[in-house]
């Protein structure tokens, strides 16, 4: 069994626990690692190892997150769990832990609570594609009708936020009993793992997506033309392929006539690599940092979008004062800042440091964007918030 661990051939899937405080997210995380280690090999993680989550920084924001790993026979999972509600909000908005799917933990003793709703809404806004439900503490509920009622409430709540509530897998279990080694409840953890394997599709790898490279620098090389450099965000660029230059200015088409890395010429540049791309017939001044190179027709420039944002607290180095509706900060997308104006939701007059809020942003220049793109909010180069494009509007 111990040989399992070194197999790097299994598909890698990112998941996490979400749900209301004290409904048992961390206990479930410990139970999954323990039961799966016992059944399929791998290492168990104790509750307290997960609970005192280390601090990490994402876009200048401090987040407490625990990362655990576990295996099923067909997949390798990386799982994130956060101790506090604020950590979840920050984590989901910054995309520090991108999830291919989430396990929503709901205590059968309480049913859905305010944070249950908020985490489902956040999941919808930030693009968590799949949710599986673990109905926890079922050992404490004898009444079958009550369990059915809670299940129905959870399904309705999911449907309300455009998740397929009627078809969502719901597992009735007890994380604590499973952790204590009770076989009846351990079986429920195996059932949950089975849903992870079958309900969450294998994520598309960055390399299989359409090519996109955020431009960091532009050089002109005499006799050869213009070179742009940056890290390939997704896909592959091959010499001879057509690309579009998108954002800030009118979209332009050109051809890649060369790819180089560390001064060596290559046939192609792949997701994750830092490359220089030589472009045919483009002048140095026609292209700038903040634009992207992309496979033609795969991404468009936009100026207006709905977003979900988290505003840093004073302790995190954010603003000391609230802001109001005339606020005009910079929005930092990929490699550049663009000034924008904001519209707050109806009835909201001001936003305090430490808040998370939905806002509509209008930028002064178009930026290549899709739903799910992350950004920072800055004032004079200092990060004061983080956000995600929930829906492109225009």
From Swiss-Prot:
- Tell me the Gene3D superfamilies matching this sequence: P-loop containing nucleotide triphosphate hydrolases (3.40.50.300), Translation factors (2.40.30.10)
**Region of interest (G5), residue spans:** 174-176
Point out the signal peptide segment.
none
Question: Which species is this UniProt entry from?
Answer: Klebsiella pneumoniae subsp. pneumoniae (strain ATCC 700721 / MGH 78578)
Q: Where does GTP bind?
A: 19-26, 81-85, 136-139
Q: Name one GO molecular function term.
A: GTP binding
Q: What is the lineage of its organism?
A: Bacteria, Pseudomonadati, Pseudomonadota, Gammaproteobacteria, Enterobacterales
Give the function comment from the record: GTP hydrolase that promotes the GTP-dependent binding of aminoacyl-tRNA to the A-site of ribosomes during protein biosynthesis.
Subunit and partners = Monomer.
Q: Specify where the region named G1 lies, as residue ranges.
A: 19-26
Q: State the name under which the record lists this protein.
A: Elongation factor Tu
Q: Where in the cell is it found?
A: Cytoplasm
List every stretch annotated G2.
60-64
PROSITE patterns referenced in this protein's UniProt entry, alphabetically:
G_TR_1, G_TR_2
Q: Which UniProt keywords apply?
A: Cytoplasm, Elongation factor, GTP-binding, Hydrolase, Magnesium, Metal-binding, Nucleotide-binding, Protein biosynthesis
> Which family is this sequence assigned to?
Belongs to the TRAFAC class translation factor GTPase superfamily. Classic translation factor GTPase family. EF-Tu/EF-1A subfamily.
Please list the residue ranges annotated as the tr-type G domain. Answer: 10-204
Q: Which domain of life is it from?
A: Bacteria
What the entry lists under Pfam families is as follows:
GTP_EFTU, GTP_EFTU_D2, GTP_EFTU_D3
